[in-house]
Amino acid sequence: MAKITIDGKACECDEGEYILQVARRCGVFIPALCYLSGGTPTLACRLCMVEADGKRVYSCNAKAKDGMVIYSRSPEIDAEREAITQVYCINHPMACGVCDQSGECELQNLAHLMRTNTQSYAIRDTAREVQDWGYLSYDPSLCIVCERCITAAKDRLGVDAFKLVPRGGDALSKEQKDAMPKDAYAVWNKLQKSLIARVNENDDCVNYGESAAVCPTGALVESAFKYVSNAWELRQIPASNPHSSDCELLYYEIKRRGIGEPREKIYRVSSDINFSVLHAAARFGWDFSNEQASKNEAVFNRIVRGIEDGEIKNIKFNSFITNEEARILELLRQKFKLALINDEALAYQKFLREFSKFSGAKFYNADSQTIKNSDFIVVCGTFLRSDAPNLGYAVNSACKLNKASGIYFHPFCDEGIKGFGKNFIHQPHATGLEAQILLWILQKFGRDLPEWLDAKLAAEFEISRAAAKQNLDEKPADSQNPENSAEANGAGNVASASGAENSASADGAENSAQNSENPAESKISNFARALGLDEQKIDEILAKKEHFSLIIGEDFIRTPNSATLARLAGLVQRYTPLKVLVVPPRTNSLGVALICELSAQMSAGETLGYNEAGDISFGVLEADLDAPSLVQQEGTFTNYDKRVVPTNAALDYGGYELNDIACALGVCAEYAIGYTPSLGADFEPIKFDDLENFYDNGGANHRGYELRNEELAASEDEFEISLSAPLRVGEGEILIYEANPLHQFNKFSGASSALGEAGALYLSPGIAEALGVSAGDVVKIYQADGASNDKKTSGAGKTSAANDKSGAARAKKMDRASDAHKADGAGDENSENGATELVNLKCEIVASVKIDPGFSGAYLPYFDEKLRGEIFFKTSRYASVKIEKISNSKGEGR
């Protein structure tokens, strides 16, 4: 720790921390229009100049040293800031009354602060037309070229979305240069030369709302908000992102609809621009509320009677609910012996419980701040930028600010990952090799491993010159080519070899391919070979790294081999320096998993669907009985940081709530938030109204509370390590993935006016070309046997039976229930591929085609339930299907 003094105030900080950050944390105001917390300094505005130990420095870029004495103001500094403020006002439209940023404009605030009431400089203006960028609108006449939009996109989102382009303004004369302070001249010179432009002129900017949020003026704004409301008329309602498990802090900005309409309306969503980042669905997908809800007493009574009389025996729901609602469901389960059905939360619950047995802790030990502070990160089992974009932002931040390196394991390439950094490597691999990833991590980083595991891992090395050459020359399968099956990367078993040490040094820099006593020999990991890893490259990017983390996604949770993966992940947390984060797949999956006792099978009887299909449904969209959306409820979520965070109701609601049903059944609290102090043993007895929800000036998190990660007695028992085999992709078939496009998360985001769209089959340009289809074409997607996601190539087995050639069992008969999900007209039993035998019935849907140049494969989304793509993904997020073109974008058939 270092001690510095700013304007006479003693401040403690880390050696090397930026002075501006220290000042903000200590409550000392230093003006700055270009700097973003957690971003790279650009020195664009130069307003943050200070005097440090007698020298002029820019506090956004100058690092604190122990004993430093800093002054934020002096006559010279004030004169510079006054001149810079005047420069920003040159030819700046004096139309604050109608500007969307008026009332929260940082330039406006600066002009008031500096008491700028004169203008000493002038130059001929240039034509600057307003530009429509889709979801964003850019007005160059208001732009001060602070570069925040560029910084936010690059350092937070990991994309090069915006760039500087020539403005075409007049050059400044020598007389103008001599007439003003040098920093003001530098700012003016840049302002005359540059404007902002999109890198891709066809980009609709749906994923770059963050860049508009950080704009200090009204230059870059949301198109839908333009000229809609004055900022000072809006009331901010603090809440949490309802769409994904980051549950990030956001504010619903509301006011009444008009003079004759007292009902309030959400006009936009905003955020704490310095410390919270919102993805597209959180920022744009907020208007999915049930604003026309009514109380259908007949349906309400039917639900109550059905549960009381034992006719309703199941409640099927998803994890887009609050902790309080989950508690209500659990109390109803206990009282009426109901089966609670939530497949994704159950899978996550089972994974966590198995993980805890072997990790020796109640929960995983990493959070998003851990990721940001890491300098080596492994990501596996997730399409990160789609499944958990805010974690993707954290990884990108670590790469940009900490020079972090790492590995992104995924069968398909996400082009956006390449923007994180040159040493953050995408490693394609065959599906089914998830266990090999964790075994390689244990082999590479494990310390003080149990003897049984140490012996197994040591047996999975080869020592030979030939093996080393083969490993370095090996090329992974090209996931983009639909003719290449996933099995090209190798089968699930790895040949055993004896010998080698398997522990890694604490900094992870030990070379697993190091030379043995014979310099011609190298030690090669069989797991690394199966995954296609270049171990020499890995050792290079591991050099001098000290802070390690591992992100595990839904691919590891939704697989028949999830129990083995959970145990191995627990061992990684316990025996390696990697901090582990297991991503909850939906908004409140972690909360539901901790609060509810979930069932794998439905009980005999009727099913109440809560925002799901059922014999009778209670939900926000197209249900028998109206339910409130998460925008209309107060309660809490448990996010992936293991924090219980509050959310508040932004809009009124006129229908029944789940708490009303519970009260009618004798499980009663006046309000749902009455359950907040009694959510369960893992939670704190804190009332809802006592929960905070903000970040302070230093970025410290004051949102709710963090769950206690209690130590548990860890299992020392040896277990059988099952290895899955890659999914078999047959002739004429293609591997598809279950995932959403980057701006979609669920049926609620898909129902919003800004993001509303129908689901489609998303293809990379390469696959689309190979299949002979284009955007807008209609295709049939089908499986002849309806169970291709269960088909495996030979090679599945155990690590102790590396030479077993028996292979995996063939596909099981398709479950009869799945046939009910077929699209109308799917599967003619008299067709060539049809038969009366159940195993040969078709699974089939029809979808239009969209092209996603950022993804190297094919995927079907789940945000649009009408698409019914889930019929292909019963046990895994991967499936092997055939795709046949039906008609082109003009509706013309083949």
PLM feature spans:
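Active-site phosphate/pyrophosphate-binding segments
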Residues: 422-478, 515-606, 685-686, 691-704, ...
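Anionic-ligand anchoring segments at beta-strand to alpha-helix junctions in alpha/beta enzyme folds, i.e.
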Residues: 316-367, 567-599
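Glycine-rich, acidic loop regions that bind phosphate or pyrophosphate groups
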Residues: 289-296, 342-473, 480, 515-530, ...
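A cross-kingdom feature strongest in bacterial/archaeal respiratory oxidoreductases
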Residues: 1, 30, 35-37, 330, ...
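Phosphate/diphosphate-binding loops
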Residues: 207-267, 374-376, 380-406, 611-623, ...
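N-terminal leader/propeptide and maturation segments of large enzyme subunits in energy/redox metabolism
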Residues: 94-120, 129, 149, 159-169, ...
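Catalytic P-loop NTP-binding/switch module of NTPases
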Residues: 242-243, 258-307, 313-321, 865-866, ...
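Fe-S ferredoxin-like electron-transfer domains
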Residues: 46-204, 208, 212-213, 217-241, ...
